[in-house]
Amino acid sequence: MNKIMVLGSTNVDYMMKMEKFPVAGETLDALEFKQSMGGKGANQALSAHRLGGDVLFITSLGNDVNGSNTLSYFKDEGLNVLPLIVENVPSGSAMIWVNSKGENCIVLNPGSNHEFTPDLINRPDIENAIRDSEIILLQMEIPYITVKKICKLASELNKIVILNVAPARELDSEILKMIDYLVVNVVEAEMISGIDYDGSNKELIIDKLLDLGASTVILTLGKHGSILKSSRYNKSLSAYDVEAVDTTGAGDTFCGAFAAELSKGSKLDDALHFATAAAAICVTRMGAQPSIPSEKEVRDFMKNNKLN
């Protein structure tokens, strides 16, 4: 039995670091180039796994070299994976630019991730795996209709559903009512709530998301920390003071860490603090999955560093 099931995307990331982003027609030399595994689903699954969670990852891969290499990589990491192989479609990939401020721009080639359709999960082994899990963790790099179906099934089975609405998109109230923890950044929160963030209306936006049906909202604010709020609970947490070199994968690391700590029976305060520390370590390193810390690294970091 896996306590955490992650369903989502897998990409091969092609990352270039540069002093600044080019404008149209401009050619720049990259300062650094790396190829690594990524995808929000894979990032979150690996984060939860490295940080002590018992994880099963379900993802859609092409029958190609990237798909084969991805499975070998997951095996080396010790991550339990149930791959859904699709023919004649390439595995997902992403081109990531990172500037000297640690900011990123990402262009996705969804490939097999867009083939992760409801028909692909109409299998007894997947339904049984959901039934045997405690926490279901999802993102938005697979089709919305698939995410909605999984949320519905998990909700009917009284599982804890965590949805990270990344990439940002609108959600209907039906799916919001199926979610136990809605994890969003400012851009994602604006899109769902319909309220523009002005720097001072965080609570207004969160309350709107709760009114729309979410049980608990976690609003991540980067270097300004995070807020976790429900009808019975309201916790604000500041961030760690670290020098960010690459924010790619920070949100995914946060989500995986939160799920991992929650699966161990930790209190919400502790899970939020642990996830914040894991994300803080992540942004000090280059790459998505290469930057995900181990559980020991996070525990040591929390002992030796204080929140702002």
Positions of PLM-derived features:
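A glycine-rich helix N-cap at a beta->alpha junction
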Residues: 77-88
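Glycine-rich phosphate/adenosyl-contacting loop at the front of the ribokinase-like
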Residues: 1-61, 65-69, 75-76, 244-245, ...
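Conserved phosphate-binding/catalytic loop of the ribokinase/pfkB sugar-kinase fold
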Residues: 86, 96-135
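Conserved phosphate/ATP/ADP-binding segment of small-molecule kinases
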Residues: 151-234
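Alpha-helix C-terminal capping segments
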Residues: 45-54, 98, 260-265
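Conserved phosphate-binding/catalytic region of the ribokinase-like
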Residues: 1-4, 170, 201-308
